[in-house]
């Protein structure tokens, strides 16, 4: 039995680290998973990220473990995952991988599971794999459904779900990598009152203001160089931090100006909201 699944990257509007509630918007960078379920109990396959093989299989094994519990069957899997989403940059690569693989397995196993439950299974797998701090339910929803998703990550409840115009978004991908597990134990409580204000802005519809406040707060707190944000703000852009970083993103009337201004800071990708 075969199945396939597809899920996207997303940008952070409000990071849930400080309050447990977060907001994200899907963007047009994709991860695709193809699977074949077997009866031999073996798991074999490959992950290819931006043309290079990726050999961390923790999340794959966690997704399979969760689905084995759902079915009660020790099925085997042959899998292929191909992704355009850089890993360790804050661009929701784990959420996209969990969503796409879970969706593919649900299809292959012919399970009658709705979309939101698929997302929640992927979040559970991500928690078990240790690739998320809060569960990243906001990221997972934006990755799966697209649009603006505002969620309570601890309760796994969607607070707001709204369609978004497909504006151009410019991504700055620095060379360094920051894995989410490296931030376990960091106390974000000191910035939670301010992040709470950003969340209220996002809920009220002013998500562009929210992403700037969120980006400035988390970038400062985590010690990132603010030069990319400063350059984008000078050009009138709405600029934020992708997850825990180090990637930044900007939404501007003249995206070409942002691309030029950011070219000296790292790799730059232009895509769109979805």
Curated annotation (Swiss-Prot):
**Which GO terms of type biological process are on file?**
amino acid biosynthetic process; aromatic amino acid family biosynthetic process; chorismate biosynthetic process
User: Where would you find this protein in the cell?
Assistant: Cytoplasm
| Superkingdom of this protein's organism | Archaea
Question: Gene3D superfamilies attached here?
Answer: 3.30.230.10
> What GO molecular function terms would the record report?
ATP binding; shikimate kinase activity
EC number(s) stated in the UniProt entry for this protein: 2.7.1.71
Q: Listed disulfide bonds for this chain?
A: none
Q: Name one GO cellular component term.
A: cytoplasm
The pathway entry for this protein reads as:
Metabolic intermediate biosynthesis; chorismate biosynthesis; chorismate from D-erythrose 4-phosphate and phosphoenolpyruvate: step 5/7
List residues binding ATP: 86-96
List the keywords (alphabetical). Amino-acid biosynthesis, Aromatic amino acid biosynthesis, ATP-binding, Cytoplasm, Kinase, Nucleotide-binding, Transferase
- Chief location category: cytoplasm
Q: Does the keyword Nucleotide-binding apply?
A: yes
Sequence similarity: Belongs to the GHMP kinase family. Archaeal shikimate kinase subfamily.
- This chain's protein is named Shikimate kinase
- Gene that encodes it: aroK
């Amino acid at each position: 039995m075969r199945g396939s699944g597809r899920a996207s990257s997303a940008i952070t509007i409000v990071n849930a680290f400080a309050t447990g509630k977060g907001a994200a918007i899907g963007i047009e960078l994709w991860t695709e998973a193809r699977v074949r379920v077997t009866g031999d109990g073996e798991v074999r396959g490959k992950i290819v990220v931006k043309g290079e093989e990726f050999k961390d299989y923790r999340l794959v094994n966690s997704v399979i473990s969760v689905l084995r519990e759902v079915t009660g069957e020790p099925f085997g899997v042959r899998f292929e995952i191909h992704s355009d989403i850089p890993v360790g940059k804050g661009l929701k690569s784990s959420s996209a991988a969990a969503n796409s693989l879970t969706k593919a397995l649900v299809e292959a196993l012919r399970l009658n599971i709705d979309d939101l439950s698929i997302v929640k299974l992927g979040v559970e797998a991500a928690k078990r794999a240790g690739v998320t701090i809060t569960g990243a339910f906001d990221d997972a929803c934006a990755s799966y459904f697209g649009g603006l998703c505002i969620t309570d990550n601890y309760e796994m409840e969607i607070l707001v779900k709204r369609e978004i115009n497909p504006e151009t978004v410019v991504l700055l991908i620095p060379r360094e990598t920051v894995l989410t597990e490296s931030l376990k134990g960091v106390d974000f409580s000191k910035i939670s009152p301010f992040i709470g204000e950003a969340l209220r802005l996002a809920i009220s519809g002013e998500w562009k203001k929210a992403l700037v406040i969120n980006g400035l707060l988390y970038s400062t707190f985590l010690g990132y160089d603010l030069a990319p944000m400063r350059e984008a703000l000078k050009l009138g852009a709405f600029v934020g931090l992708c997850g825990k970083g180090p990637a930044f993103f900007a939404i501007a009337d003249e995206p070409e100006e942002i691309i030029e201004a950011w070219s000296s800071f790292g790799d730059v990708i232009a895509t769109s909201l979805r």
